[in-house]
């Protein structure tokens, strides 16, 4: 059975910080946050590189978006708005679902992989904790053999006699910079 590839085409507008922890793990609840993720969820704690990271929304209600993401008009192509349904079998998800997948990865679910599809210069500026980086050009510009290695080593695909077997493939969640960004869609289409 072919697994559905999921795409979160907008970078989470959340902040994160390393929380201190001792014998007990952070509960994901911080008393009195005014800007919550949902009415019931103030923060989401995940493991990233051996540390607990608390993801929460920026508490400054006067905060403005980072200028790197503030342009409302970009030349198309290449910065064209992506369709809501990228391809058959591909589901576009929102930020809450992205957080659920990050929690699954954090709790040790090896069947889910959250991928930052952006190029290295974007990742260096910041990424979502708990993700791995597979830049969009890695799949679109590589040889068939290299792509097969990625499918096997990262995505859980197995090689049969002459076909690839997707029976145990992981659920992939890909993201990039937003609606105008084609990096995750390029990875998905590859």
Task: For the regions a language model picked out, list residue spans one by one.
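Mid-length scaffold segments of soluble, non-membrane domains
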Residues: 104-155, 162-168
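N-terminal signal peptide c-region/cleavage motif recognized by signal peptidases
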Residues: 15-17
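Flexible, polar/low-complexity N-terminal or interdomain linker segments that lie immediately upstream
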Residues: 21-125
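Cleavable N-terminal signal peptides
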Residues: 8-10, 19-20
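Phosphate/oxyanion-binding active-site loops and adjacent basic polyanion-contact surfaces
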Residues: 90-94, 139-140, 144, 183
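Bacterial N-terminal signal peptides that target proteins for export
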Residues: 1-6
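Catalytic cysteine-centered active loop of the rhodanese-like fold, especially the PTP/DSP P-loop
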Residues: 155-190
């Amino acid at each position: 059975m072919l697994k559905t590839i999921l795409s979160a085409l907008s970078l989470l507008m959340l902040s994160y910080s390393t929380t201190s922890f001792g014998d007990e793990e952070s509960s994901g609840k911080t008393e009195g946050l005014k800007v919550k993720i949902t009415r019931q969820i103030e923060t989401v704690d995940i493991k990233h590189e051996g540390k607990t990271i608390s993801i929460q929304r920026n508490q400054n209600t006067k905060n403005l978006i980072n200028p790197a993401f503030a342009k409302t008009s970009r030349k198309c192509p290449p910065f064209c708005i992506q369709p809501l349904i990228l391809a058959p079998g591909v589901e576009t998800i929102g930020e809450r679902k992205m957080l659920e997948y990050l929690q699954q990865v954090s709790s040790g679910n090896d069947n889910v992989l959250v991928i930052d599809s952006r190029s290295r210069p974007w990742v260096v500026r910041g990424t979502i904790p708990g993700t791995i980086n597979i830049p969009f050009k890695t799949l679109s510009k590589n040889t068939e053999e290299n792509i097969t290695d990625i499918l096997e080593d990262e995505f859980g695909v197995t090689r049969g006699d002459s076909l690839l077997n997707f029976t145990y493939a992981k659920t992939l969640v890909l993201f990039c910079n937003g609606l105008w960004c084609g990096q995750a869609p390029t990875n998905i289409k590859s």
